[in-house]
C-alpha cells in the first residue's frame, strides 16, 4: 500500500508541476488572456477609426459640402463675394511694447 501512495504522490507532484510551470501552464494562459484583451481593445479602436474614415470617404464621394469644407480649411478656398479675415494671435512682446508706449505718453 505504501508504494502505491508514493506513486500517486509522485504523479500528483508531476501533474502540479506541469500545471504551474510546464507547457500551456496557467501562467501562460493568464498571459495570453491579457494579451488577447489588449489586442481586442486595440482592434475596437481601429474599427472605430475605420468607420470614421469610411464615412468621410462616402461624404467626399457623394456631397460637395465636405469637399468644399476641406478645400477651405486646407487650401484656403474663398468664393466670390466673400471676405477673408485673418485673426492674428496676440504676441506678448507687442502687448508689452504698446503698454510701454502708452506709459511714456
UniProtKB/Swiss-Prot annotation:
An individual GO BP term: FtsZ-dependent cytokinesis
GO cellular component term of the entry, any: cell division site
Coiled-coil annotated spans: 38-75
Periplasmic topological domain: 22-105
Keyword Calcium: no
Keywords of this entry: Cell cycle, Cell division, Cell inner membrane, Cell membrane, Coiled coil, Membrane, Transmembrane, Transmembrane helix
Family annotation (Pfam families): DivIC
Residue spans, topological domain Cytoplasmic: 1-3
Entry's localization field: Cell inner membrane
Main localization, broad class: membrane
Parts of the chain that traverse the membrane: 4-21
Entry annotated with the keyword Transport: no
InterPro entries attached to this UniProt entry: Cell_div_FtsB (IPR023081), FtsL/DivIC (IPR007060)
Topological category with respect to the lipid bilayer: Single-pass type II membrane protein
Known function: Essential cell division protein. May link together the upstream cell division proteins, which are predominantly cytoplasmic, with the downstream cell division proteins, which are predominantly periplasmic.
Subunit structure: Part of a complex composed of FtsB, FtsL and FtsQ.
NCBIfam families the record matches: PRK00888.1
PANTHER family (UniProt xref): CELL DIVISION PROTEIN FTSB (PTHR37485:SF1)
UniProt similarity note: Belongs to the FtsB family.
Protein name (database record): Cell division protein FtsB
Species of the source: Shewanella amazonensis (strain ATCC BAA-1098 / SB2B)
Gene: ftsB
Amino acid at each position: 500500500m505504501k508504494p502505491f501512495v508514493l506513486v500517486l504522490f509522485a504523479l500528483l507532484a508531476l501533474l502540479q508541476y506541469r500545471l504551474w510551470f510546464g507547457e500551456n501552464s496557467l501562467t501562460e494562459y493568464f498571459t495570453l488572456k491579457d494579451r488577447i484583451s489588449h489586442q481586442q481593445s486595440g482592434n475596437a479602436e481601429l474599427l472605430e477609426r475605420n468607420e470614421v474614415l469610411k464615412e468621410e470617404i462616402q461624404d467626399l464621394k457623394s456631397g460637395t459640402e465636405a469637399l468644399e469644407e476641406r478645400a477651405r480649411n486646407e487650401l484656403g478656398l474663398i468664393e466670390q463675394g466673400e471676405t477673408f479675415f485673418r485673426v492674428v494671435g496676440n504676441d506678448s512682446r507687442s502687448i508689452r511694447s504698446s503698454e510701454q508706449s502708452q506709459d511714456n505718453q
